[in-house]
Amino acid sequence: MTDKQSLKQHLLQLDNRGYKAYKEIQGSYNFDEFTLIIDWVQGDPFASPSKFRVKIPPNIARIPCELFQSRSREIALRDYLTRQFDKAARHTSSKRGTGKSGTIAVTRLGQEVLERTSALIVSSNTSDSEDLGGVEMRFSVGLPAGGRSILGRQAAEMLCEDIPRIVSLSLKYSSLNAAECRRHVETVEDADWLREQLAEKRLVAFVADGSILPRRSGVDNRPLLNDAVAFVSPPSLKVEFNCPNRGLIFGMGIPAGITLIVGGGYHGKSTLLRAIELGVYNRIPGDGREFVVTNPAAVKIRAEDGRSVAGVDISPFINHLPQGRDTVQFYTENASGSTSQAANIIEALEVGIRKFGNEQCTGFNGCQSDGSRKKEEGKGNEEQERRKKEQDLVPVLLVDEDTAATNFMIRDRRMQELIAKDKEPITPFIDKVKQLYADCGVSTILVMGGSGDYFDVADTVISMDNFQAYNVTEKAKEIANKYSASRAAEGGESFGEITHRVPVPASLDPSRGRRDVRVKVRDVDELAFGNEEIDLGAVEQIADSGQLRAIAAAMVCAKQQYMDGKRTLSEIIDLVMADIETEGMDILSSFPEGDFAMFRRFELAAAINRLRSLSVVAKR
Ligand code: ADP
Ligand code: MG
């Protein structure tokens, strides 16, 4: 391995040569306090920037081990260090020539604290520093060029002066703000802890008092600055927790079952639901929603007309389409509002729930009696662990009327009179939502300002009034008794069967031209997979472009490793997720990737399900 001085010499010698000569600097370099690794060098100044890493050993980084001793803390610390590096890099780097010349950048960061491959903690095994952590940081560098020739002196400055300065400012514990770092780590640990407590209290979400839910604008996810009304729980829904770091915290607990959020237009309903949707992830301190936590399997469901659907059994909701179209294996290139919403629900159930129909369901809030639950406590730990894992996957559905198909949500008395049941393919959600809970343990939180018919099926009704929440359950029940909706229930005896699907391996093809794998990600909503474009604009719980990058890689892994024409989609996703859990996200790429962020099985399934070439066979 050569040192910093020789790298500098080399760069100065490269001055004015053609850009391709930069390839020569690929390799590892011993800097005074860390190792610089140049994994990959870009082909020209306009291409994606070059991939770099620095490794700072524990005796230099000196990060106290209590900051990474639990999994939550470690993930939070990695996120924190990435943000510090980002700040220092923005401050230090500047444009130095054509194209991307001069940039030094880590992965893009938003409000969420996610497990990211941008930073890793390296613990030491030498005895003199065994309580300290080191850091590996991955980032990209736009190697400088004037036109297409190398700017050697600028490159030497960037690599041999700027990078050491950034490292020194952001990755050495002595230069960090210790209190802020601790707060980051403790906040995330508390949020994870809170999320774990939900099931035991039979809650699906918790919104802490004092939370700031509204965002600065439709394109700015930071908290609204002025005029934001802080959240206060209605007294009758108030719960308390004693967090490991923060101590007592109060807020609104949303119980398992069916919850309506009602209220006038512009009174904060959607803002509350949006915070709950993203409560499956942790947020940075100061976000305002850092203690809004949601069941980890909560899935936003919406209408998404125009999407493709591949062989999904939407028959629990939709039957007898015109022209005799099959809804047991429903294929379309262009779904309607209602069929897309039905497919979105069934697809979430397909990867979330293990058993259906007459077999016992596994939802914590579902059909198991207390008696059977007690019996289970006698069984081995392993069995309990397995059950707990399965329970963690049972979806909670989140629906907002703003993005739902009206004819999927409601069908009132008058319409039932005019259009007979046998002329209407759709069984509306209102007739299925109770069965979902009773048969499968699937809870629903539904924003519905427009139809009081739902009072009949709701367990809890929360009203938003001037951005304040009230528990109006009793009143809604009284009204439901006073004015009958007079609807005929159309849902039948039970929710119905969920048919698992086996993907046809050839229908997922990441290759393009001569390249075996060509995947490309744009922001959080577009993914190019081989020759296909996947539109994920309606998959609202992909919060970070790094998640989509990792999803793209996981799709390739799913195809190459596990799609064999026999396994179901759900089994394939289980295997991929288990690999990531045991080996880390690095198994998704052949070189050290700094731009992956952790995602959920639901979003991986969502991407596969939106691939227009996907074809499946039903597993009966
Ligand atoms: P609804 O779904 O009830 O029609 P929204 O949730 O879309 O209402 O909110 C309407 C507007 O009010 C949005 O601009 C939102 O940012 C803002 N808003 C929501 N909650 C609050 C709050 N707690 N304090 C201040 N403004 C809020
Ligand atoms: Mg709304």
Question: Which residue stretches match the model-derived regions?
Answer:
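Long, charge-dense accessory insertions within large macromolecular proteins
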Residues: 173-229, 306, 323-330, 339
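N-terminal pre-Walker A segment at the start of P-loop NTPase domains
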Residues: 216-250, 293-294, 298, 302-309, ...
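Glycine-rich phosphate-binding P-loop
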Residues: 249-277
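Conserved P-loop NTPase nucleotide-binding/switch module
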Residues: 349-358, 366, 371, 389-433, ...
